[in-house]
Regions:
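Short acidic/polar inter-strand loop motif in beta-rich domains
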Residues: 82-84, 120-128
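A glycine-anchored, Pro-Gly-centered beta-turn/N-cap motif
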Residues: 47, 109-111
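Short beta-strand elements
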Residues: 129-141
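N-terminal signal peptide c-region/cleavage motif recognized by signal peptidases
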Residues: 17-19
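Short amphipathic, basic-aromatic surface patches that mediate peripheral association
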Residues: 54-65
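Short, compositionally biased P/S/T/A/G/V-rich stretches that sit at domain boundaries
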Residues: 23-46
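Short coil-to-beta strand junction motifs in C2/discoidin
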Residues: 65-73, 132
Length: 141
């Protein structure tokens, strides 16, 4: 009996100490996010340009709105995907579009850059399964 109580207590302790975001908000398996513009290999003249973001089989909502099958865009610039069970960082390499934007005008210095989209839930955590685009490369002149 005592062993059963200790086992149950340990199981409960593990359950209660696991972060709430460890299992992301569910997403449809056929959902995908993509770039409308720019396209892979695009050459951008001047540092400022529009990024237009698309999403299929899910909807866009602002941060803080906890509905099923919705999220908001995050643009990853010159970086790898962050840990997919944690909130997406907010810095110069991880731009948040928490108001539900589907396009943005950004500025990058001259050179080769990579861009990738990652959809986040109401808490900026990637969905489960995560919804992200292929990484594209652009050149800014």
């Amino acid at each position: 009996m005592r062993t059963a109580l200790i086992t149950a207590a340990l199981a409960l302790a593990v359950f209660w100490t696991t972060p709430a975001f460890a299992a992301g908000t569910p997403s449809p398996k056929d959902a995908y996010v993509y770039f409308i513009w720019p396209s892979d290999g695009a050459v951008i003249h001047g540092g400022k340009f529009w990024v237009r973001m698309g999403l299929r089989n899910m909807g866009i909502s602002p941060r803080g709105v906890a509905l099923s099958d919705v999220g908001h865009h995050h643009l990853l610039i010159d970086t790898e995907l962050p840990p997919l069970t944690e909130p997406i960082p907010s810095d110069r390499n991880h731009l948040h579009f928490g108001a539900g934007e589907t396009e943005a005008r950004i500025e990058l210095p001259p050179g080769k850059h990579t861009l990738q989209l990652l959809l986040g839930d109401h808490n900026h955590v990637p969905h489960d399964p995560p919804v992200y685009s292929k990484k594209i490369s652009i050149i800014v002149q």
